Swiss-Prot record:
Reported function: Snaclec that binds to von Willebrand factor (VWF) and induces its interaction with GPIbalpha (GP1BA) (via the vWF A1 domain), resulting in platelet aggregation. Intravenous injection in mice induces a dose-dependent drop in platelet count (thrombocytopenia). Pretreatment by intravenous injection by this protein in mice potentiates the hemorrhagic lesion in the skin provoked by the metalloproteinase BaP1 intradermally injected. This result is not observed when both BaP1 and this protein are injected simultaneously.
Subunit organization: Heterodimer; disulfide-linked.
Tissue specificity note: Expressed by the venom gland.
Origin species: Bothrops asper
InterPro entries the record matches: C-type_lectin-like (IPR001304), C-type_lectin-like/link_sf (IPR016186), C-type_lectin/snaclec_domain (IPR050111), CTDL_fold (IPR016187)
Example of a GO MF term: toxin activity
Superkingdom of source: Eukaryota
Family membership: Belongs to the snaclec family.
Protein name in the entry: Snaclec aspercetin subunit alpha
Domain (C-type lectin) ranges: 9-62
A GO cellular component entry from the record: extracellular region
Compartmental location: Secreted
Amino acid sequence: DCPSGWSSYEGHCYRFFHPPKDWADAERFCTEQAKGGALVSIQRFGEEDFVSNLITKNLQRG
């Protein structure tokens, strides 16, 4: 189970954060959000679709 505000896909938790950050700041930020947290690293096509949809949904919210 993922914390409130996070989305689950194949046993992993994902969350879109705003505003944009550079790579180093984003990685640091992600490690502070949850134990084992890190920037997403796409491993397979289904995960790519899931993350793409998550980004699109969050950008549409503004």
